[in-house]
């Protein structure tokens, strides 16, 4: 991939993550972290609503189906490891419940938020 194409892809990802964050806020979530980095990898968005911590992967693709297919099992393990690091830092962690979501961004469509898209115990 050439440098210009990489930059375009990066910027598309940034735009998709911002749009996803706004969508979550409109649904009543508080954005706790964006691009949360650990030694295991990065989580696009960590959002909270009540006692639910949503670990959100954002995928921008031409169709919702392509976005759903873009999440792979090794990524899911990365999310779980990074999510546990975030959770360990929360003072009320015993009351919190983790959920792993996907927000699919497609051109000319509203974002699609799929709650509980994957479950780490299925790895």
Per-range role (PLM):
Residues 2, 60-108:
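Catalytic cores of nucleic-acid endonucleases
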């Amino acid at each position: 991939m050439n440098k210009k194409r990489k930059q375009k892809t990066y910027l598309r990802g940034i735009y998709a993550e911002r749009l996803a964050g706004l969508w979550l806020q409109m649904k009543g979530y508080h954005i706790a972290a964006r691009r949360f980095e650990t030694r295991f990898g990065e989580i696009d968005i960590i959002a909270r609503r009540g006692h639910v911590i949503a670990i959100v992967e954002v995928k921008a693709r031409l169709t919702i189906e392509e976005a759903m297919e873009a999440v792979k099992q090794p990524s899911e393990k990365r999310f779980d490891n990074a999510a546990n690091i975030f959770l360990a830092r929360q003072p009320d962690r015993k009351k919190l419940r983790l959920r792993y979501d996907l927000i699919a961004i497609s051109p000319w469509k509203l974002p699609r938020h799929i709650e509980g898209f994957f479950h780490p115990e299925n790895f």
